[in-house]
Amino acid sequence: MPLILLPAVDVVEGRAVRLVQGKAGSETEYGSALDAALGWQRDGAEWIHLVDLDAAFGRGSNRELLAEVVGKLDVAVELSGGIRDDDSLAAALATGCARVNLGTAALENPQWCARMIAEHGEKVAVGLDVQIVGGKHRLRGRGWETDGGDLWEVLQRLDSEGCSRYVVTDVTKDGTLAGPNLELLAGVAGRTEAPVIASGGVSSLDDLRAIATLTGQGVEGAIVGKALYAGRFTLPQALTAVRE
C-alpha cells in the first residue's frame, strides 16, 4: 500500500490557518476552511485532516462549520481538536467523519478514553504529541500547553486497551518545515501493531519519500500542512512521489 497523504485544514474562527509549533498567535491565514478542504479534494486527496484549533485551545469551537465541511466533501475526514468528553465526541462523529482523534483526553482522562476506544474501535485514533526533552519523550496536551507523561508508558497503556491507530507529532517540528522525525516514527511503529500516521515537519517531496520507506514498518500515512500551503510542492506531485 502506498503512503496515504492527509492534507491538513486547521481551523480558527472559520478560517484555514497554519501555526508554528502549535503556538496560538503564530497563525498564517489561508482563506475559508471549506474552500481549502474542497481544494485538496479537487487535487486528489483521499483523506482530509480537519482540526478545530479553537476547540483544541479551549477558546470556543467551529462545530457547525466542521459539520458543514464534512458534509460537502466526498472524501474521508479525520476530525481532531478539543474532543475530550461524550458531548464533543458525539458531535464529531455525528458530522459523518470517518474517524476522530483524541488528544488531551487520552492523557487527562484515561478511563474515558479507554471506554471510547472500546465503544468506537476504528473510528477513534489517538494523537500523540511528543516533545523530546533531554533525551526523554514527553507527551504534550491541551494544544501542547501541558505535560502528559512518558510517551512509551502511555503507548503501552493505549495498546493494551486496543487503540486502533496513532497520529504521531514531533511538537518541535510541526509547522516549521524542518523535516519529519523519522527515528520517532520508526520507534513508535516498532512498539505497536496499530498503524501510525506521521504529522509535523514535512517540507519536501524527499521528506515524504523518506516517510514512505517506513510503510513496511507500520507507518500508514502522513499529514501534510504548511509545505502544501507554502507552495513547496503540490498535492498531485506529493501523491506521485509516494507512489513511485
Curated annotation (Swiss-Prot):
Q: What is its main location?
A: cytoplasm
Catalytic machinery residues:
10 (proton acceptor), 129 (proton donor)
Where is the protein found, in the record's own terms?
Answer: Cytoplasm
Q: Which InterPro entries match?
A: Aldolase_TIM, His_biosynth, HisA/PriA_Actinobacteria, Isoase_HisA-like, Isoase_HisA-like_bact, RibuloseP-bd_barrel
* GO biological processes: L-histidine biosynthetic process; L-tryptophan biosynthetic process
Q: Which GO terms describe its molecular function?
A: 1-(5-phosphoribosyl)-5-[(5-phosphoribosylamino)methylideneamino]imidazole-4-carboxamide isomerase activity; phosphoribosylanthranilate isomerase activity
Q: What class of enzyme is it?
A: isomerase
The record, for CDD domains, names:
HisA (cd04732)
Query: Could you tell me the keywords of this UniProt record?
Result: Amino-acid biosynthesis, Aromatic amino acid biosynthesis, Cytoplasm, Histidine biosynthesis, Isomerase, Tryptophan biosynthesis
* Pathway listed: Amino-acid biosynthesis; L-histidine biosynthesis; L-histidine from 5-phospho-alpha-D-ribose 1-diphosphate: step 4/9; Amino-acid biosynthesis; L-tryptophan biosynthesis; L-tryptophan from chorismate: step 3/5
Query: Record's Pfam families?
Result: His_biosynth
- Protein origin, superkingdom: Bacteria
The answer, when asked if Translocase is one of the entry's keywords, is no
Catalytic activity field: 1-(5-phospho-beta-D-ribosyl)-5-[(5-phospho-beta-D-ribosylamino)methylideneamino]imidazole-4-carboxamide = 5-[(5-phospho-1-deoxy-D-ribulos-1-ylimino)methylamino]-1-(5-phospho-beta-D-ribosyl)imidazole-4-carboxamide; N-(5-phospho-beta-D-ribosyl)anthranilate = 1-(2-carboxyphenylamino)-1-deoxy-D-ribulose 5-phosphate
Entry's Gene Ontology cellular component terms? cytoplasm
Which SUPFAM superfamilies does the UniProt record give? Answer: Ribulose-phoshate binding barrel (SSF51366)
* Leader sequence residues: none
What does the record give as EC number?
5.3.1.16, 5.3.1.24
UniProt lists the family membership as follows: Belongs to the HisA/HisF family.
What job does this protein perform? Involved in both the histidine and tryptophan biosynthetic pathways.
The record, for PANTHER family, names:
1-(5-PHOSPHORIBOSYL)-5-[(5-PHOSPHORIBOSYLAMINO)METHYLIDENEAMINO] IMIDAZOLE-4-CARBOXAMIDE ISOMERASE
Q: Entry's HAMAP family? A: HisA
Q: Mind telling me what this protein is named? A: Phosphoribosyl isomerase A
User: What species was this sequence derived from?
Assistant: Mycobacterium ulcerans (strain Agy99)
